[in-house]
């Protein structure tokens, strides 16, 4: 039987994971670079690889978990890491598309500019699956699958393309898709966490202090 993290153990794990580290920033930059190339070359396989590498999911999960257990420290850490990662991602992707000799908008780029209700449903389902998968102590393929399904990397890179080419529609359309993904993954995490705790908010809060 697979062991799961308790609420307290999972909170401590997130405390440890949610820091702006050079190592994680380097990994993020590599993931953004790979995703940008994939979008530029219209290569789905390359984009999927970048999504598996990206650490963008962690602060969103941390934010949802922090809100679910009313933990201001975790909320602050998650926001700091997420904002830093978004800024780094925009910078790297903008620089890439600014120097790239391929300036045309591929179908992979265009697909990230018009969010639909399906994106909302995917983010919700992915967020719920992520809550379950991230609580397991043993390695599993749930969290990587969520990273692919919810596709956080491509919209950020597409926003970088919009900045590099002065295309407002690409910039705001992609940022809107990224925001939708973040918000609904976070909301699914809040609901999923409360369900998994199986206790009243008050007793759960006391248990964590």
Pin down the residues of each PLM region.
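Juxtamembrane/interface motifs at transmembrane-helix termini
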Residues: 67-70, 80, 95-98, 164-165, ...
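Juxtamembrane transmembrane-helix termini
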Residues: 41, 100-103, 164, 194-200
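Transmembrane alpha-helical segments of integral membrane proteins
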Residues: 63-64, 157-160, 190-198
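Cytoplasmic membrane-interface regions of multi-pass membrane proteins
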Residues: 67, 72-73, 138, 195-203
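Alpha-helical transmembrane segments and their membrane-interface boundaries
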Residues: 1-121, 136
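Cytosolic-side transmembrane helix boundary signature
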Residues: 186-209
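Alpha-helical scaffold segments in soluble metabolic enzymes
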Residues: 13, 36, 94, 128, ...
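Hydrophobic alpha-helical segments
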Residues: 113-186, 190
């Amino acid at each position: 039987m697979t062991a799961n993290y308790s609420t307290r153990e999972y909170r401590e794990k997130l405390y440890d994971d949610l820091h702006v580290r050079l190592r994680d920033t380097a990994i993020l930059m590599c993931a953004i670079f790979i995703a940008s190339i994939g979008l530029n070359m219209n290569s789905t396989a390359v984009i999927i690889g970048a999504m598996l590498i990206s650490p963008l999911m962690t602060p969103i999960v941390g934010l949802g978990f922090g809100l679910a257990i009313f933990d201001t420290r975790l909320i602050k850490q998650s926001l700091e890491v997420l904002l830093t990662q978004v800024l780094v991602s925009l910078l790297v992707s903008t620089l890439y598309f600014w120097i790239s000799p391929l300036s045309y908008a591929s179908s992979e780029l265009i697909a990230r500019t018009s969010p639909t209700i399906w994106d909302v449903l995917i983010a919700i389902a992915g967020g719920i699956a992520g809550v379950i998968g991230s609580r397991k102590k043993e390695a599993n393929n749930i969290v990587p699958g969520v990273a692919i399904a919810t596709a956080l990397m491509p919209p950020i890179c597409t926003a970088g393309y919009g900045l590099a080419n002065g295309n407002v529609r690409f910039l705001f359309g992609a940022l809107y898709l990224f925001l939708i993904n973040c918000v609904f993954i976070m909301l699914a995490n809040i609901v999923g966490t409360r369900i998994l705790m199986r206790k009243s908010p008050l007793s759960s809060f006391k248990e964590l202090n």
